[in-house]
Amino acid sequence: MEKLRVGIVFGGKSAEHEVSLQSAKNIVDAIDKSRFDVVLLGIDKQGQWHVSDASNYLLNADDPAHIALRPSATSLAQVPGKHEHQLIDAQNGQPLPTVDVIFPIVHGTLGEDGSLQGMLRVANLPFVGSDVLASAACMDKDVTKRLLRDAGLNIAPFITLTRANRHNISFAEVESKLGLPLFVKPANQGSSVGVSKVTSEEQYTIAVDLAFEFDHKVIVEQGIKGREIECAVLGNDNPQASTCGEIVLTSDFYAYDTKYIDEDGAKVVVPAAIAPEINDKIRAIAVQAYQTLGCAGMARVDVFLTPENEVVINEINTLPGFTNISMYPKLWQASGLGYTDLITRLIELALERHAADNALKTTM
């Protein structure tokens, strides 16, 4: 059987660039090489695309704090539409190896916000993960919360700040509505980039300024007292949920360094030590949230479980990490689906959805 060529797109012009490199390394290592050939498509921090050498594409590959994309002499351009060669050498216009399906693992801005997905749709390339709308909606925490709330799902109370209204809403008003502590977040960032915990007006001002360094819109959330539970969802029209896992923190909250740099910052417990009926309740809510946002392929749904066993949805991540400590693959391993089989299934789901999309009528 002829192997499929899988283009793994990674890196990106994002605050989560290094996280993406870690995820790509693990996917390359785990992919079923008897079924798939890998084409590495690395994006540097300036947004330039490169074809990378699979044997030597990372610097400091085993050091999360210093991992980097190795410079490549071959930069590429993409040719939209149905062509024999979708990728060409940007320097000389010569065709580059074709790909059958794209596995995007570009976390954060321009990677999981619908931008990359839109480009791949225009190129008529199958790709792993959610489509444009779901990707954009889940990336924007303000939009996510509004859609979940309208669907009757439980979310933390919040206020949205923009550059236009931020000075019209005082700290006293925010505290009166949401109480303390607060969490201040850029609306369109992941991996806790630019997130602060706030317990005073002085901290609030600093936190809002920091969040606006990363986005034009900022979310201020009520702090929820509860356990941090995560659930993995997999599928297109009939998604399935994994068993649940828990993030047990040794720090104040799940910050970027806690997730990816400090090995002692948090403990990942899979499966979570919760009652079976609570596990099933969270799994059902995760699937409902996934379908509400129109997700496909995969997503990780993060919730808080309060002492009263109330489930409060925190966020939905449509391109969850595949790093050594990432919860998404661990949850499926605990549910009986190994790392290699998970990657294979994600590729299959991408091809299935692409075939269904191409079967739709485009003319009257």
UniProtKB/Swiss-Prot annotation:
Keywords of this entry: ATP-binding, Cell shape, Cell wall biogenesis/degradation, Cytoplasm, Ligase, Magnesium, Manganese, Metal-binding, Nucleotide-binding, Peptidoglycan synthesis
The enzyme's E.C. designation: 6.3.2.4
A GO biological-process term: cell wall organization
Subcellular location: Cytoplasm
Gene Ontology cellular component annotations, sorted alphabetically: cytosol
Cofactor(s), names only, from the UniProt record: Mg(2+); Mn(2+)
Catalytic activity of the protein: 2 D-alanine + ATP = D-alanyl-D-alanine + ADP + phosphate + H(+)
Tagged with keyword Metal-binding: yes
ATP-binding as UniProt keyword: yes
Signal peptide (residue range): none
Pathway: Cell wall biogenesis; peptidoglycan biosynthesis
Binding-site residues, Mg(2+) 1: 302, 315
EC main group: ligase
Chain ranges of the ATP-grasp domain: 145-348
InterPro entries linked to this entry: ATP-grasp (IPR011761), ATP_grasp_subdomain_1 (IPR013815), D-Ala_lig_Van_CS (IPR000291), D_ala_D_ala (IPR005905), Dala_Dala_lig_C (IPR011095), Dala_Dala_lig_N (IPR011127), PreATP-grasp_dom_sf (IPR016185)
Classification via PANTHER family: D-ALANINE--D-ALANINE LIGASE (PTHR23132), D-ALANINE--D-ALANINE LIGASE A (PTHR23132:SF25)
Record function comment: Cell wall formation.
NCBIfam families in alphabetical order: D_ala_D_alaTIGR (TIGR01205), PRK01372.1 (NF002378), PRK01966.1-1 (NF002525), PRK01966.1-4 (NF002528)
HAMAP family for this protein: Dala_Dala_lig
Family according to the record: Belongs to the D-alanine--D-alanine ligase family.
Protein's UniProt name: D-alanine--D-alanine ligase A
